[in-house]
């Protein structure tokens, strides 16, 4: 009976661990605005891309954004690397006339670990290059 309980506990732990490993993690938070992006009237005027500061602008005065054709795409805690990989879905595909990028705060805070200032700047430059290439 002791061996059976140990074996059963081992199987339960293994199943729990395998289910955690099998879960997909949306590191860049692609899903955050996926449904809202489908409802945007194209082309949009301005997309505000950023972190919690940008998200706060939208949350504090969403009527101002809506009345002016502005779209808020800030996500709390985001780093420039995360913003860069979701830039196509949350900015380019919305065909804005302009984009405002507020980025770098969470990189400096090392939310995803250390990143050099050169790489932070490189991510921001890449976003601006993508915006220019698709304008």
Question: Can you annotate each of these PLM segments?
Answer:
Residues 1-24:
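Bacterial Sec-dependent N-terminal signal peptides
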Residues 11-12, 38, 108:
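A periodicity- and composition-biased signal for non-globular, repetitive helical segments
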Residues 21-98:
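Serine-esterase "nucleophile elbow" of acetyl-processing enzymes
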Residues 2-3, 63-68, 85-135:
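Alpha-helical cap/lid subdomain in secreted, periplasmic
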């Amino acid at each position: 009976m002791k061996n059976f309980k140990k074996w059963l506990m081992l199987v339960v732990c293994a199943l729990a661990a395998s289910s955690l490993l099998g879960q997909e993690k949306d590191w860049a938070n692609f899903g955050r605005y996926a449904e809202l992006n489908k409802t945007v009237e194209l082309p949009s005027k301005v997309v505000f891309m950023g972190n919690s500061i940008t998200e706060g602008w939208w949350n504090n005065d969403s009527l101002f954004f809506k009345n002016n054709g502005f779209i808020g795409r800030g996500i709390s805690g985001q780093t420039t690397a995360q913003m860069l990989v979701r830039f196509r879905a949350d900015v380019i595909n919305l065909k804005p006339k302009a984009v405002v990028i507020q980025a770098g705060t969470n990189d400096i805070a090392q939310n995803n670990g250390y990143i050099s200032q050169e790489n932070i700047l490189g991510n921001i430059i890449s976003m601006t290059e993508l915006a220019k290439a698709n304008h």
